[in-house]
């Protein structure tokens, strides 16, 4: 456990020594701070100079990583050891994008050979849709693709397709359906022509309640309009491992793309779950996405900790969570194409590390994953940045932006990028009472009024942030960015001694929903309901009589 590691008390002592130091002072005393605390990898750079740390902090954090045998645990993941201990599974999302030729054997399975076989089928299918060779039941080309999934079968593909929209096939429109409330699927369907629509049903078991409910609604809509169930074969494909259920639905087994237990949902966009990405963007761009992630994998696996982006970001996060007692972490992308990135990272981070039981089954006596949240940075400035600047919570921030200007939008990117830099500077530097008072007096305010108002215009600063810069929003850079966060999450899971690759927390609610659903549908359940739940069931039933 973290608190039992030999470096932990050293970090506690060091924290007490520097907790009151203001970053302003570090910057004023160290003119090289910005250049020393800056890393570049391929087209991605990290400025971590605006963090509440110094060389001693970093030295101790790297010692902490060594205490945890982080290097050995990184190797164990890449080699296919069953590090998902509660489910006795390997964790090989990295193999999905591997460009190495050294085969990985897992329970007599040739992992890379299996992955590349599915990728080959995905490429052929994608080409047939994009080229117009694959036609609908009236011989129309496909114009719309509907991805039906939830969680990891939705968020990654949605994020990537949105981020890389500029690379999409001009004929194709992407739609994503995950919510089971009925509104989303019906809103999507009313825009579509069944004769030119392709549905991708993404569910490993092909029994996920939300996904199957939406898929059956889409199937009913399609059959009613096409007039014959046999047309399903041309318009529905599945990403699943349950061949029997897929065939019962009416999908041809040749239109089923498999993935494996060694790929967790939140790590699956690189697998057949990314079929929608490949069709929308094309195999060339999908390959570039994989390559960007692979290059980050190699960096994570081989770079010294001192220059290793995922290791550094993971350790800095631990520094705030376990020593500064930070409970929250903000993702603030300053690019419209990255608007779904915070939501994707929410699942990646919180479903992986939102746990309090160690690998040995013991209750952990320290904090693990913070609440991860975020929004488009420029919009967030006018919504909740007030709390970040002057509130009572210490919330580290990841600013994410690109250097590349958008065509036909003169002046826009300069305004956007200036705000990234200004906000990061403001969070670091702040504004003292004396500075606020001087500004108000300079503007001509009465001295007594200025003294009172100045208190409200103080910014304490010392708010930490990272600035992640991509040269441009491209397939390879998005691949690298996602892999960076995947590995950051892994690093923190190792430090906290938790299994980052299971998600038992999603199960209990699903189990309890079964008897409640029976009651709502008018069937008697033998389950026990607390008085609150029972009353709400009756309220629903009475309203819908």
Curated annotation (Swiss-Prot):
The lineage of its organism: Bacteria, Pseudomonadati, Campylobacterota, Epsilonproteobacteria, Campylobacterales. It comes from Helicobacter pylori (strain Shi470). The active site is at residues 351, 382, 510. Its main location: cytoplasm. It is an enzyme of class 5 (isomerase). Pathway: Carbohydrate biosynthesis; gluconeogenesis; Carbohydrate degradation; glycolysis; D-glyceraldehyde 3-phosphate and glycerone phosphate from D-glucose: step 2/4. This is Glucose-6-phosphate isomerase. The keyword Isomerase applies. It is found in: Cytoplasm.
């Amino acid at each position: 456990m973290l608190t039992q590691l030999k470096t932990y008390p050293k970090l506690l002592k060091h924290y007490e020594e520097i907790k009151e130091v203001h970053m302003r002072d570090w910057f004023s005393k160290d003119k090289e701070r910005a250049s020393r605390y800056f890393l570049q990898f391929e087209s991605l750079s990290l400025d971590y100079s605006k963090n509440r740390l110094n060389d001693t902090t970093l030295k101790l954090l790297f010692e902490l990583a060594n205490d945890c045998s982080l290097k050995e645990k990184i190797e164990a993941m890449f080699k296919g050891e069953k590090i998902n201990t509660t489910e006795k599974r390997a964790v090989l999302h990295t193999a999905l994008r591997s460009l190495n030729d050294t085969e990985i054997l897992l329970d007599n399975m040739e992992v890379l050979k299996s992955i590349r076989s599915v990728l080959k089928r995905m490429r052929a299918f994608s080409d047939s849709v994009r080229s117009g060779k694959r036609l609908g039941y009236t011989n129309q080309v496909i114009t719309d693709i509907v991805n039906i999934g939830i969680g990891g079968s939705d968020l990654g593909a949605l994020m990537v397709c949105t981020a890389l929209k500029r690379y999409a096939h001009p004929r194709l429109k992407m739609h994503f359906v995950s919510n089971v409330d009925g509104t989303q699927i019906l809103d999507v369907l009313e825009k579509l022509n069944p004769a030119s629509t392709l549905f991708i049903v993404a569910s490993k078991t092909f029994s996920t309640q939300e996904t199957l409910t939406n898929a059956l609604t889409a199937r009913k809509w399609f059959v009613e309009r096409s007039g014959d169930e046999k047309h399903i074969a041309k318009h529905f494909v599945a990403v699943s491992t349950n061949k029997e259920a897929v065939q019962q639905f009416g999908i041809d087994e040749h239109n089923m793309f498999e993935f494996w237990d060694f790929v967790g949902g939140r790590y699956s966009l690189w697998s057949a779950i990314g079929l929608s990405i490949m069709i929308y963007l094309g195999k060339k761009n999908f390959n570039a996405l994989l390559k960007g992630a692979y290059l980050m994998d190699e960096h994570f696996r081989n770079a010294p900790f001192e220059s290793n982006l995922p290791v550094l970001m993971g350790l800095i996060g631990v520094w705030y969570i376990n020593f500064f007692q930070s409970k929250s972490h903000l993702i603030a992308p300053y690019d419209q194409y990255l608007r779904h990135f915070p939501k994707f990272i929410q699942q990646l981070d919180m479903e992986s590390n939102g746990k309090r039981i160690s690998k040995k089954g013991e209750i952990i006596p320290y904090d693990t994953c913070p609440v991860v949240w975020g929004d488009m940075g420029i919009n967030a400035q006018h919504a909740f940045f007030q709390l970040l600047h002057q509130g009572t919570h210490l919330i580290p921030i990841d600013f994410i932006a690109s250097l590349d200007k958008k065509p036909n939008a003169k002046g826009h990117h300069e305004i956007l990028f200036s705000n990234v830099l200004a906000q990061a500077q403001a969070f670091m530097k702040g504004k003292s009472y004396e500075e606020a008072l001087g500004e108000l007096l300079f503007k001509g305010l009465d001295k007594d009024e200025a003294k009172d108002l100045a208190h409200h215009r103080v910014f304490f600063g010392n708010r930490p942030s990272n600035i992640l810069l991509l040269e441009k929003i491209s397939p390879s850079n998005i691949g690298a960015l996602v892999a960076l966060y995947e590995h950051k999450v892994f690093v923190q899971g190792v430090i906290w001694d938790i299994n980052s690759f299971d998600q038992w927390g999603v199960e209990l609610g699903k189990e309890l929903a079964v008897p409640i659903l029976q009651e709502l549908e008018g069937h008697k359940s033998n389950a026990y309901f607390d008085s609150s739940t029972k009353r709400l069931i009756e309220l629903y039933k009475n309203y819908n009589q």
